[in-house]
Amino acid sequence: VGVIVRSMNLRLDDLPHTGMTNYKDTPLEMRIPAAAISTNGAEKLSALLKQNPNLKLYYKQSCQTYDDVLSHNVIGEITGSEHPENIMVVGGHLDSWDLGDGSQDDGAGCVQSMAVLEMFKQLNYKPKNTIRVVLFMNEENGLKGGIQYAQVAKNNNENHIFALESDSGGFTPKGF
C-alpha cells in the first residue's frame, strides 16, 4: 500500500515537483509510503490504468531523512532615521528542494530582498523606519528559520510594522 501523487504544476515534463509528507504524530506502523511523480509520468500511468484497471505498480524508494543540523538566518538592515524601533522586513529563504538549484525557489526572493537595501544605499535614501532583510533558513522543511526569527523578535520585544516574504520566483508579482 502506498500513495503516488501527480506533481503539483501545470507543465508537462519529467521532473516531479517534490514536496513532503508530514505524518505528525501518526504511529510508524500506520504510515504509508508516498511519492510524487512527474506530470508526464502521471499521464502515462493514467493511460495504463484506463487500459488495465487491475494494473499493479511496484516502486522502490531510497529516500532518507537526516537529522537536523544547526543552521542560521542571514540578516542585514538599514537603521531607521526617525523610528529605528519600527522594523519593516523583506525576505526570502535560502534552502531549496532536491531537484532544483534554488534559483527560483527561492534564490530570486533572496536577491529581490537584498536589492531593496542596495537600491536604498545607491539612492542615499534614509528610511524613517528600520528596513531589515531576512534570508530565512529551513523554510522548505518546516519554516524553522521563520519560527526562530519570530521567537527571537518576540523575546527582544521588537516592533514589526511590515513583513513581506517573496517565494514565487523571479516572475511578475501576483499579489501583495
Predicted features along the sequence, with ranges:
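BRCT (BRCA1 C-terminal) domain core and associated BRCT-interaction motifs
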Residues: 4-21
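Short gly/pro/ser/thr-enriched loop/turn and capping motifs at secondary-structure boundaries
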Residues: 10-13, 38, 171
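Short, well-ordered, mixed-charge alpha-helical segments that flank or form enzyme active sites
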Residues: 11-14, 67, 143
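Charged, often glycine-rich, active-site loop that binds/positions anionic groups
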Residues: 17-23, 143-148
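Acidic/histidine-rich catalytic neighborhood of metal-dependent amide-processing enzymes
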Residues: 70-73, 96-176
